[in-house]
Structure formats: structure tokens, C-alpha cells
């Protein structure tokens, strides 16, 4: 019997007890998990250094190293995140609606856990803690499979978390880590229908596509973020520049960072030099189409494959468009359904953009970086769903539940 099947069986068994745990039991567990995380800070940072040293030797990019790195502050933030989940309302047991049929049956909808959640992700060890906290709060057992880049960090984090879970009296197998990071085991996990109720991949396009191609377990796609900002002809240049810089340069390795900049042809000669100067001052390399190159001749030419690429780095590609309609067409062709923004003072164009752009989050005069559970007021999130079934956009606690129908009768037969 493989390690994964054993973990699957243990998770399924744990999910039954965890699913009926009280809010107080779950909140107590989260508090103790946070305490154990802080106690293990030294061990976690030592383990993370092993991962970072290996990543540097492999020539990993600066942006990806930032994703991988753990510091005192980041671990304290992870612990604080667990405590923040305590403050969120527990959705489990909520009766959403109740109605009575003519025959006297009373029918209701009640929120219940999904059961066992599998999460496959890459070099972001903070996901390990975030996912564990959200799953505990919603009564779901979780099987975590992180990338090989962060395996030592993840082991240390899960060791601390499971110590806290065990101390709280909840099943230790509520949170488990798959320590074999081979593709074969990942594929086996994608097909573990007997034990895993839903699979959530978090990572780049390659990982997402591999899961969609191989999984027989139902998948919630947390898609890649090829996010666009369209700067309309009627806009405040200073606002537009500041939004572009924030969306691209504040943290380029995350999925809600802007990857493409579309500029209306009527303002490009005036606006492009301003924004390119600001981008370069923030360390961002700029690629562009032929029109962009004709205005600033040292811009690198953007190839066709650039338009659909998620860089996750200090790179942005610029395209000049005729109007809002061409911008919308380009976004709907190359976007990934994540987050898209228009900078405009035109109400008409803003409404057209909101209605026609097909994405989970569509912005008017704001940075795409706000697509985040905490920024939306949901608290922590498990990921940003770019699909339309079950969940779309930031996935908070309610998105980790399903519906059970409860029916009360007094002897009715059909």
C-alpha cells in the first residue's frame, strides 16, 4: 500500500471527526497551531535556508526566490493569519434557507464541509499554513503536496502545525504533507477519487494544465494570472502611472500582478514615455509592439507568445490599441480570466469594460493587486478561482463548503 493511499485513508477518517467539530474546538486548534508555528520559527528558517541555497544554485529568479523565502516576519505573519481565521465566522452548520412544501415537508439547505481537500502547489511555503488553517476552520481534512523547491520548509511547517492539532485534540491526520515530490506521486494524487473530494492546484500554467489533464478527482482551477491594465484615452496620467507601477512592481511574482499594459493610441505618444521611465526606475523590463518601439526605440520587441505569457517577474509587455473595444477583444483572447483593469474617466467605457471583459475580477481605476481574499473582506483565501463552476474569484471559507439538504417530515410518503 502506497504512502499516498495510507494518507488518503487517514485523511478520510479524520474528516468525519473534523466535520462535526465545534467552532470552539476548531478555533482552539488554530490558536495552538499558531503558537507551535512561532515556537518552531528557528527550525523552519533553518529548513527554508536549505531550500533557498538549493534554489540559488539552480539559478532561480529573484522573484521566485522571494516567493520561497521565509523570514521571522513572514512566519509571524503566517501565525497571525491563523489567528485571523479564528475571527472569521464559521460557515459550517449555517442553514441557508428553509421552506415548507404543500405536503408539510420542511426542506432546508445547510452548509457542510467538502470532506478531504487535496492541494498541489509550487514554491510558496506560506500556502502550506494558509491552506491548513482554512481547511481546519471549515472542517475539511487536507492533503498537501508542495513543490520540491520548498520540501524542507513544508516539512518543518507541517510538523509544527500537526503538533498543534494533536495538542488540541483534533485528529492529527487533519493536515498531512505528501513528502514524495515526484511527478508520479503527484499524478497518483490527482486520481485518488476514493479519498479526495476536490483538488485545488496553485501555481503556474504548467502545473495547472498538468492537473487538468491528469486529474480524475474534481478540480477547482486557480488559474494563472495574465492580468492586463488598459489605459483609456480619457484618463488621469498620474493615476494611471501609479496603478501600473503598483500592479507590476509591488510584487511581480504573484498571480494578481499585471503582466500586460494596453494603451489607447490617442495618448500613447504622451503616456508611454512617462510610464516606461517609471517602470524602468522600478526595475521592470519593458517589451512592446511595433508602435511602442517606434516611440521608444530601445524597447524589446514582444513576440506573439508574449501576449499569453504570465511572466511572474519584473517584465511587462505593452500593446497599443485603437479603443476600448480592441482592448476588450485582446484581453478576452489572451487573458486567463483572473483580474483585468481599465483606467478611464469615461463612465461609458468603464461600463462597457465591466460588462464585456470575461474575468473573475474586473476593475475600474484600481490596481489588480487587490484580487485577494483579505482585501475583499473575506479573510484568508485558498486561491483565486478562474473557473465558473462552484467558485469564482478569491476562495474564502464559504467556497470550501458544499450544500446538504435537510428534510423534516411527520410520516409523509410518496
Swiss-Prot record:
Pfam families referenced in this protein's UniProt entry, alphabetically: Aldedh
Catalytic activity as recorded in UniProt: L-glutamate 5-semialdehyde + phosphate + NADP(+) = L-glutamyl 5-phosphate + NADPH + H(+)
Class in the EC hierarchy, top level: oxidoreductase
Primary localisation category: cytoplasm
InterPro entries: Ald_DH/histidinol_DH, Ald_DH_C, Ald_DH_N, Aldehyde_DH_dom, G-glutamylP_reductase_CS, Glu-5-SA_DH, GPR_dom
Annotated compartments: Cytoplasm
GO term, biological process aspect, one: L-proline biosynthetic process
Involved pathway(s): Amino-acid biosynthesis; L-proline biosynthesis; L-glutamate 5-semialdehyde from L-glutamate: step 2/2
A Gene Ontology cellular-component term: cytoplasm
Keyword terms: Amino-acid biosynthesis, Cytoplasm, NADP, Oxidoreductase, Proline biosynthesis
PROSITE patterns per the UniProt record, alphabetical: PROA
HAMAP family, A to Z: ProA
Similarity comment: Belongs to the gamma-glutamyl phosphate reductase family.
Descriptive protein name: Gamma-glutamyl phosphate reductase
Organism, scientific name: Clostridium beijerinckii (strain ATCC 51743 / NCIMB 8052) (Clostridium acetobutylicum)
Lineage of producing organism: Bacteria, Bacillati, Bacillota, Clostridia, Eubacteriales
Encoding gene per record: proA
Amino acid at each position: 500500500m502506497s504512502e499516498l493511499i495510507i494518507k488518503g485513508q487517514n485523511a478520510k477518517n479524520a474528516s468525519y471527526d473534523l466535520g462535526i467539530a465545534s467552532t470552539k474546538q476548531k478555533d482552539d486548534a488554530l490558536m495552538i497551531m499558531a503558537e507551535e508555528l512561532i515556537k518552531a520559527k528557528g527550525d523552519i528558517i533553518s529548513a527554508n535556508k536549505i531550500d533557498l541555497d538549493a534554489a540559488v544554485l539552480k539559478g532561480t529568479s529573484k522573484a521566485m526566490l522571494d516567493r520561497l523565502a521565509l523570514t521571522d516576519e513572514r512566519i509571524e505573519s503566517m501565525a497571525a493569519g491563523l489567528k485571523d481565521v479564528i475571527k472569521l465566522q464559521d460557515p459550517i452548520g449555517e442553514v441557508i434557507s428553509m421552506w415548507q412544501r404543500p405536503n408539510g415537508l420542511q426542506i432546508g439547505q445547510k452548509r457542510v464541509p467538502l470532506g478531504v481537500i487535496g492541494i498541489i502547489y509550487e514554491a510558496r511555503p506560506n500556502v502550506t499554513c494558509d491552506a491548513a488553517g482554512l481547511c481546519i476552520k471549515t472542517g475539511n481534512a487536507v492533503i498537501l503536496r508542495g513543490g520540491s523547491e520548498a520540501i524542507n520548509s513544508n516539512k518543518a511547517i507541517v510538523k509544527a502545525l500537526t503538533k498543534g492539532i494533536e495538542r488540541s485534540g483534533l485528529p492529527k491526520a487533519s493536515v498531512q504533507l505528501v513528502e514524495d515530490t515526484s511527478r508520479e506521486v503527484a499524478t497518483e494524487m490527482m486520481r485518488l477519487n476514493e479519498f479526495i473530494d476536490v483538488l485545488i492546484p496553485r501555481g503556474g500554467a504548467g502545473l495547472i494544465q498538468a492537473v487538468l489533464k491528469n486529474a480524475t478527482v474534481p478540480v477547482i482551477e486557480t488559474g494563472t494570472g495574465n492580468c492586463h491594465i488598459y489605459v483609456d484615452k480619457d484618463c488621469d496620467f498620474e493615476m494611471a502611472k501609479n496603478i501600473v507601477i503598483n500592479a507590476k512592481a509591488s510584487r511581480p511574482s504573484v498571480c494578481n500582478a499585471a503582466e500586460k499594459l494596453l494603451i489607447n493610441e490617442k495618448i500613447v505618444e504622451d503616456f508611454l514615455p512617462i510610464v516606461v521611465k517609471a517602470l524602468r526606475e522600478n526595475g521592470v523590463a519593458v517589451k512592446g509592439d511595433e508602435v511602442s518601439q517606434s516611440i521608444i526605440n530601445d524597447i524589446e520587441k514582444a513576440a506573439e507568445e508574449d501576449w499569453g505569457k504570465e511572466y511572474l517577474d519584473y517584465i511587462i509587455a505593452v500593446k497599443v490599441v485603437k479603443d476600448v473595444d480592441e482592448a476588450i477583444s485582446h484581453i478576452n483572447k489572451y487573458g486567463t480570466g483572473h483580474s483585468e483593469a481599465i483606467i478611464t474617466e469615461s463612465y461609458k467605457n468603464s461600463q462597457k469594460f465591466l460588462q464585456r471583459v470575461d474575468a473573475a475580477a474586473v476593475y475600474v481605476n484600481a490596481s489588480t493587486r487587490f484580487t485577494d481574499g483579505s482585501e475583499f473582506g473575506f479573510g484568508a483565501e485558498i486561491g483565486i478561482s478562474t473557473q465558473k463552476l462552484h467558485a469564482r474569484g478569491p476562495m474564502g471559507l464559504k467556497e470550501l463548503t458544499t450544500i446538504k439538504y435537510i428534510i423534516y417530515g411527520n410520516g409523509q410518503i410518496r
